[in-house]
Amino acid sequence: MGITSAGMQSRDAECGERIFTRTVRQVKQQTTVHYFVSPPRPPVKTNPQAKTLISTRLEVATRKKRRVLFI
């Protein structure tokens, strides 16, 4: 495995909306974001004929009540 870094980010849980009379409350949660190698940056183009940039793989795993994002 390579070098890793991790950090906590606050994100809005879109699936956690609760609708009350005339109000909408959104549940916020802490999300652990774990970056493999380094934090996200624009990928380097190695092929001059490539029309699109290669994006990083994003995996979302739920553990107990927290979501863990692997990039």
UniProtKB/Swiss-Prot annotation:
Identify the InterPro entries for this entry. Answer: YqgC-like (IPR020102)
Induction of its expression: Transcription is increased specifically in response to 2,4,6-trinitrotoluene (TNT) and its indicator compounds 1,3-DNB, 2,4-DNT, and 2,6-DNT.
Q: How is it used?
A: Has been used to construct a 2,4,6-trinitrotoluene (TNT) biosensor strain.
Instruction: List the protein's name.
Output: Protein YqgC
Native organism is Escherichia coli (strain K12)
